[in-house]
Protein backbone atom coordinates (compact mmCIF):
# COMPACT_ATOMS: atom_id res chain seq x y z
CA UNK A 1 0.00 0.00 0.00
CA UNK A 2 1.33 3.45 -0.89
CA UNK A 3 1.55 6.27 1.61
CA UNK A 4 -1.13 8.95 1.59
CA UNK A 5 1.25 11.93 1.44
CA UNK A 6 2.86 12.20 -2.00
CA UNK A 7 4.38 15.71 -1.91
CA UNK A 8 4.12 17.98 -4.95
CA UNK A 9 5.26 21.60 -4.77
CA UNK A 10 2.76 22.94 -7.28
CA UNK A 11 -0.23 21.15 -5.80
CA UNK A 12 0.69 22.35 -2.29
CA UNK A 13 0.86 25.99 -3.43
CA UNK A 14 -2.39 25.71 -5.40
CA UNK A 15 -4.34 24.22 -2.51
CA UNK A 16 -2.86 25.92 0.54
CA UNK A 17 -0.97 28.90 -0.89
CA UNK A 18 -1.23 32.55 0.11
CA UNK A 19 -3.14 33.65 -2.98
CA UNK A 20 -5.73 30.92 -2.55
CA UNK A 21 -6.21 32.01 1.07
CA UNK A 22 -6.66 35.64 0.03
CA UNK A 23 -9.41 34.73 -2.46
CA UNK A 24 -12.04 33.84 0.12
CA UNK A 25 -13.38 35.51 3.25
CA UNK A 26 -12.70 32.36 5.25
CA UNK A 27 -9.15 32.18 3.91
CA UNK A 28 -8.50 35.77 4.96
CA UNK A 29 -9.80 34.87 8.41
CA UNK A 30 -7.27 32.04 8.58
CA UNK A 31 -4.44 34.44 7.68
CA UNK A 32 -5.70 36.98 10.20
CA UNK A 33 -5.78 34.38 12.96
CA UNK A 34 -2.29 33.13 12.09
CA UNK A 35 -0.94 36.70 12.11
CA UNK A 36 -2.58 37.30 15.50
CA UNK A 37 -1.07 34.12 16.87
CA UNK A 38 2.34 35.16 15.55
CA UNK A 39 2.96 32.27 13.19
CA UNK A 40 6.28 32.44 11.36
CA UNK A 41 4.71 31.02 8.18
CA UNK A 42 1.21 32.21 7.29
CA UNK A 43 0.58 29.77 4.44
CA UNK A 44 2.26 27.13 2.27
Swiss-Prot record:
A GO term from the CC aspect: ribonucleoprotein complex
Family: Belongs to the bacterial ribosomal protein bL34 family.
PROSITE patterns cross-referenced by the UniProt entry: RIBOSOMAL_L34 (PS00784)
Pfam families membership: Ribosomal_L34 (PF00468)
Residue span of region Disordered: 1-44
Keywords of this entry: Ribonucleoprotein, Ribosomal protein
Top-level taxonomic group: Bacteria
Name of the protein in its database record: Large ribosomal subunit protein bL34
Gene Ontology MF terms: structural constituent of ribosome
Gene Ontology biological process: translation
NCBIfam families: rpmH_bact (TIGR01030)
Amino acid sequence: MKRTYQPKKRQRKKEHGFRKRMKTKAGRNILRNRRRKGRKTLSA
